[in-house]
Amino acid sequence: MTDVLAVIREMSSSFTPSEAKIAKYILENPTVVTELSVNELANACDTSEASIIRFCRTIGLKGFQELKIKIAVSLAKQTRKLDGGITSEDDVMAVIQKIANFNKQAIDSTIAVLNAEELTKAAEALANANKIDFYGVAASGVVAYDAMLKFSRINIPCTAYQDTHLQLTSAVNLKKGDVAFGISYSGATKEIVEAIQTAKEAGATTISLTKYGQSPLAKAADINLFVSSEEAMFRAGAMASRIAQLTVIDILFILVAQKKYNDVVRYLENTSEVLSMRKINN
């Protein structure tokens, strides 16, 4: 079941001013909202009942009653969060606990917003691709490289591009049967959006991996995969979002491996054997 509070959080940047006001109140007062009528919530948000209903439909719900039920479910499933981000006073154990907690929350929230149908479509496209180009910069570039390492081990032709000029020169030469996979947590990285648009115009199937919501990258791609994470103020290399993205790549890798199971077993045995020769024996 989708975590409606996570959905509202991730869609916040795409809401209209009226919707943003409703979202802010819900996120700040989720327990209170479960006890309000639609009229009471409208008054609390200084808006109309019709606006509340439109908001519900914007986030994929049928109406206000469903919103209240899903908020109650989200609250029931919430685990206690460690208070605040990392501070200069935190000892080693506090840092260990907080990082583990941030990453766990990112994975749990991502599982809540992942769409099985879109995952299936993405896995099908990747399994049948003539070649795959992964595009990402900075922390998302690390995820693109990880994806290339995984899929190359099962004999799927793929390349990870972090250089923005190479992304464009790759994208423009793709064709039908190829896949371009753009990775950007914000979904607004100009170079990644341009590369995906270029690949799509060239005839390739395009996939995006970005935070939940209608970002420029999500609008440009054929297939959208979403992650969810709340980054702490003190962060190193977009930690939580990177973990969420890597989790989706792992899921896709297994889904593709299932589709090519007999071949994959042989490929993994081959790669394991050849790499074992590079290890130093004690």
Curated annotation (Swiss-Prot):
Gene Ontology terms: biological process: carbohydrate derivative metabolic process
A single GO molecular function term of this UniProt record: DNA-binding transcription factor activity
UniProt domain HTH rpiR-type: residue ranges: 2-78
InterPro entries in the cross-refs: Homeodomain-like_sf, HTH_RpiR, RpiR-like, RpiR-like_SIS, SIS_dom, SIS_dom_sf, WH-like_DNA-bd_sf
Top-level division of the source organism's lineage: Bacteria
Keywords of this entry: DNA-binding, Transcription, Transcription regulation
DNA-binding positions: 38-57
Species: Caldanaerobacter subterraneus subsp. tengcongensis (strain DSM 15242 / JCM 11007 / NBRC 100824 / MB4) (Thermoanaerobacter tengcongensis)
Alphabetized PROSITE patterns for the sequence: HTH_RPIR, SIS
Keyword Transcription: yes
Protein name listed in UniProt: Uncharacterized HTH-type transcriptional regulator TTE0211
Pfam families given in the database record: HTH_6 (PF01418), SIS (PF01380)
Residue intervals of the SIS domain: 122-262
